[in-house]
Amino acid sequence: MVVRGILGRQRREYRAPEPHPSGARAPKLPGELIPNHVACVMDGNGRWAKERGLPRTEGHKVGEGVVMDVLKGCIELGVKNLSLYAFSTENWKRSPEEVRFLMNFNRDVIRRRRDEMDALGIRIRWVGRMPKLWKSVVQELQIAQEQTKDNDAMTLYFCVNYGGRAELADAAKAMAEDVAAGRLDPAKVSEKTIQKYLYYPDMPDVDLFLRPSGEQRTSNYLLWQSSYAEMVFQDVLWPDFDRRDLWRACVEYASRDRRFGGAVPNEQLLEMERDMKGSEGVQDA
């Protein structure tokens, strides 16, 4: 299979993802039941390493391959947006040695993998704060963004130095500055106004919030975007995770009745959305 995309006026062919070594294939779900945006907390690296008597850093190293496998699984299934929590604003509290490792690691992962992601048609977007981040990390993230900006097989939101509260605080600060400068009428502030001040106003809402490792919390991740997300928690640690676990989570997501605060069954909501939007849904892989 070759996935095709448009780059300017030229048609570009993306490389097809390699099948999973087990031979497993993505489940065939109706396009409207495939989550458009999956947010994932990559948790359990330290525990995985500890169970094996290894340094915590070894769990992160194994997790790099998991990232690529999950991205390929997204493309195979038809998930168009994936957000990965790579380094939070709270992670600065870890030991200087681990912070140093994670800075180097995130920089090097992007450097090592950006060509492969580009070949697969993945658009990379960095989400997070610039202050405190190493210049070399910022540079690699910016290079990756520029290199992949026209890709359209899927979008990876790579969250480095990100926190949901930090994003909302930054949005509030920017809004306050615009109010003080007379560029924004506070009486007209709405949810749509706040959305415009987020790091990526066009980031779609999270449909499926996925966390491996057995922990059941959001950890300050994409708070605004996850307001109506379906939560799936899995016991597998991130280094043991692969695209089959992603697919299981998506099958569970597809079985749920999303009401968005109302009392109308999911099927009827989908029908109304199709009528209003002209069947704008995620297409089958």
UniProtKB/Swiss-Prot annotation:
Cofactor binding description:
Binds 2 magnesium ions per subunit.
| Region annotated Disordered, chain positions | 11-30
According to its UniProt record, the EC number is 2.5.1.-
The positions annotated for binding Mg(2+) are: 43, 230
Protein keywords = Magnesium, Metal-binding, Transferase
Q: Which GO terms describe its cellular component?
A: cytosol; plasma membrane
* GO BP term (any one): polyprenol biosynthetic process
Instruction: Provide the residue positions that the database annotates as binding substrate.
Output: 44-48, 56, 60, 88-90, 92, 94, 211, 217-219
Instruction: Write down the required cofactor(s).
Output: Mg(2+)
Recorded GO terms, molecular function? ditrans,polycis-undecaprenyl-diphosphate synthase [(2E,6E)-farnesyl-diphosphate specific] activity; magnesium ion binding; manganese ion binding; Z-farnesyl diphosphate synthase activity
Active-site residues are: 43, 91
UniProt xrefs under Pfam families: Prenyltransf (PF01255)
Output the superkingdom of the source species. Bacteria
- Report the family membership: Belongs to the UPP synthase family.
Function text: Catalyzes the condensation of isopentenyl diphosphate (IPP) with allylic pyrophosphates generating different type of terpenoids.
Entry's PANTHER family? DEHYDRODOLICHYL DIPHOSPHATE SYNTHASE 2, DEHYDRODOLICHYL DIPHOSPHATE SYNTHASE FAMILY MEMBER
Q: How does it assemble?
A: Homodimer.
Q: What is this protein identified as?
A: Isoprenyl transferase 2
Q: Which organism is it from?
A: Streptomyces avermitilis (strain ATCC 31267 / DSM 46492 / JCM 5070 / NBRC 14893 / NCIMB 12804 / NRRL 8165 / MA-4680)
